Amino acid sequence: MKLKHLEMTLQPIRGYYHPRAALEQYQTPAPLAARLLYHALMKGDIEGKTVCDLGCGTGVLAIGAALLGADRVRAVDCDPKAVEGANANAAQLDAHVEFIVADVRDDALPGLLESCDTVIMNPPFGAQKAHADRPFIDLALSIAPVTYSIFNAGSAQFIKTYTAQRAEIDEKVGGIFPIKRTFSFHTHDVQEIEVEILRLIRKQ
C-alpha cells in the first residue's frame, strides 16, 4: 500500500464522540498517522510484527498497522468510550485489532501486553498535565525494542535526556498536527502544531 492510499484509507476513521480535555483527546489526523505508519513499514517494523498502540484513542494508528500487515495488533486506552469508537472503526475497515481498556500506569499492563516488536503512539503532549507523556514512554520502552511516537516539535532533546540510559533516538521526522476547535478554551478554528515523529531504539 502506497502512502497516499494509506492516508485515504485512514481518512474516514471517526474521531472522539465526547472528547475529554483532561486526556488531551485529539484525533490523530490521517496524513500524520499515515506518515508515521508508512515510515515504520519501510523500516520493517510493521509487516509480520506484533504491534502495540498505547493511548490508541479511536484507533487510527492501530487500525493502520493492521491494514499494513502486522501479525498482531494490541491497542490500549483508558477511556471506554474511545475504545468503543475504535472497535467500531476497526470493524468498518475489517481490521483485526485487540483493544484493551486500561491505564498505561497500571502495573499489571506490561504483563497483560506481554512483549511486542513495535510500539506506535501519540501520547498526550502535557498541555493539561505536565509530563503526561512519561508513563507512555516508560511502558513503551519496557515492552518493545522499537518505538515510534509523536511529540511536540523541539521535544527530542528532552526525550534524549529522559531516556538516555534506556534508548537512543534513531530518527526524527517533522510533521504538522492541525487541531480543530474542540474545547471552550480554543480560540482558533484550526491551529497547526509542529510535531516530530521519533523512532526510539531500546538499548540492550
Could you tell me what each predicted segment is?
Residues 1-204:
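Class I S-adenosyl-L-methionine-dependent methyltransferase catalytic core
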